[in-house]
């Protein structure tokens, strides 16, 4: 919760306090949220002694159609009949498409901010969605946030760069992007979950995505994720070297 800078400071302090004890390897793992750009290739992203997940948040590893199918199969409940993996796949894409401009705005704000003091949303946080998700609405709300922050911090608002980034991400988030399931990597999973939950409970009122997460964590398999597998191998090598 402290962000990458807070976590690094904590680890440096802990490492210093333990310096007189036996040799050890100290590493951290965190999601990148909007603090660090997502690389084109999924893999190990180690900065100092902090490892960043490839996907936007930890929930992005859980909010996947396969996990819904596994959970529903495990519950073996007739209540969720018809909520197949294919249906969840389509609903996930529908939900993500509704958030296209909002996610473009959040990504752009994350890249233009000079510190974590500037948020990437004008709502109370991830999962709290704006009332209006249109392209112009997200653009104007972002510019207001950026300008207000710049005035308070005594900075020059980089609106030109924001405009360029926003346009680029709006174009990037096209049909091919969603068909390749890249929204599962790029979009803030808490935001997508909020929209998806409404779509699912409209038909299956008793269904909870939180239960899917619990099931997915209990049965988590890192092998589909190159970055996590690299991390596992990296840690194993460090342990062997001790």
Predicted regions and their residues:
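Acidic, divalent-metal-binding catalytic cores of TOPRIM
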Residues: 1-242
């Amino acid at each position: 919760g402290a962000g990458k800078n807070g976590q690094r400071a904590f680890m440096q302090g802990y490492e210093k306090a333990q310096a007189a004890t036996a040799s050890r390897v100290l590493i951290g793992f965190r999601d990148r949220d909007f603090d660090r750009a997502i690389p084109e290739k999924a893999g190990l992203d180690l900065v100092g002694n902090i490892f960043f997940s490839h996907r936007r948040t930890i929930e992005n590893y859980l909010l996947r159609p396969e996990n819904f199918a596994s959970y529903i199969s495990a519950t073996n409940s007739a209540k969720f009949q018809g909520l197949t993996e294919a249906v969840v796949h389509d609903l996930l894409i529908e939900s993500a498409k509704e958030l296209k401009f909002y996610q473009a705005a959040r990504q752009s704000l994350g890249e233009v901010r000079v510190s974590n003091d500037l948020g990437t949303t004008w709502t109370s946080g991830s999962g709290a969605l704006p009332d209006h998700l249109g392209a112009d609405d997200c653009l104007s709300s972002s510019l207001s946030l950026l300008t207000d922050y710049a005035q308070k911090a005594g900075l020059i608002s980089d609106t030109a760069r924001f405009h360029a980034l926003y346009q680029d991400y709006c174009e990037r988030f096209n049909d091919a992007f969603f068909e390749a399931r890249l929204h599962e990597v790029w979009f803030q999973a808490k935001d997508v979950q909020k929209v998806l939950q409404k779509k699912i409970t409209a038909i299956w009122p008793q269904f909870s995505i939180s239960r899917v997460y619990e099931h997915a964590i209990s049965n988590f398999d890192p092998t589909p994720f190159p970055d996590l597998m690299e991390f596992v191998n990296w840690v194993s090598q460090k342990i062997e070297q001790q």
